[in-house]
């Protein structure tokens, strides 16, 4: 099995719902909370836009996301670590679009982004690649402030930014100690010359399997005949 290679904070959170008598029957509370949170956020956003008659493309986006997650993500038992993180990614995109295209309170908006990106990465370590969206945030801030030192001050003064950086460092260090890779299973981030490191061929095989699964080339009861060609 994969063991601790693909750990997620969702596992630890779900373990809190292992209660006497009820036992593991409340494990699904965690994805219910995530889906409920997303629905609440989207409903509030859509309602505020409609109530103030400020219709724009973000309103349409939020409405489409609301419909999408309730049609395709309604089966709570299938969430795992992927779908809960994907729901938050859709919310994150909405917040980034809002910050980039409209006048908002920068400090408040940045805090939301750091919290969302932090949760996404904590839920699914592989999604640390979405941390690249941080570049978009810095670029937007630089365009507004026109001064790198001012941008740096805004980031450093934000407590969530420091927590975000600590989370990234901790996650990379954890991945390295467990697998020999900074981002598992991304082969280019691996140092397979270490004694404890997973063999690079095994990392590549798992990376291909993830890609095959993500592109619909495999499922619980089927898989394509030629995975490499399919990918």
Q: Which residue ranges define each predicted feature?
A:
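Multi-pass, polyprenyl lipid-linked donor-dependent membrane glycosyltransferases
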Residues: 30-34, 71-98
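Short hydrophobic alpha-helices at membrane interfaces in multi-pass membrane enzymes
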Residues: 58-63, 100-119
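Perimembrane helix-loop-helix junctions
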Residues: 130-165
């Amino acid at each position: 099995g994969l063991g601790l290679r693909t750990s997620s904070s969702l596992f630890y959170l779900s373990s809190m719902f292992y209660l006497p008598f009820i036992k593991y029957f409340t494990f699904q509370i965690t994805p219910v909370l995530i889906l409920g949170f997303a629905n609440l956020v989207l409903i509030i956003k859509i309602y505020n836009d409609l109530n103030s008659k400020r219709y724009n493309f973000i309103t349409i986006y939020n409405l489409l996301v609301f419909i999408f997650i309730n049609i395709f993500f309604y089966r709570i038992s299938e969430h795992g670590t992927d779908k809960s993180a994907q729901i938050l990614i859709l919310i994150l995109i909405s917040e980034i679009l809002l910050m980039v295209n409209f006048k908002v309170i920068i400090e408040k908006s940045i805090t939301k982004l750091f919290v969302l990106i932090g949760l996404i990465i904590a839920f699914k370590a592989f999604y640390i690649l979405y941390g690249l969206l941080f570049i978009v945030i810095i670029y937007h801030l630089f365009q507004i402030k026109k001064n790198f030192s001012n941008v740096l001050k805004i980031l450093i003064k934000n407590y969530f930014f420091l927590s975000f950086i600590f989370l990234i460092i901790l996650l990379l260090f954890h991945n390295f100690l467990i697998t020999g890779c900074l981002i598992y299973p991304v082969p280019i981030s691996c140092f397979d010359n270490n004694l404890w490191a997973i063999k690079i061929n095994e990392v590549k095989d798992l990376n291909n399997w993830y890609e095959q699964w993500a592109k619909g080339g495999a499922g619980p009861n089927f898989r394509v005949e030629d995975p490499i060609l399919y990918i």
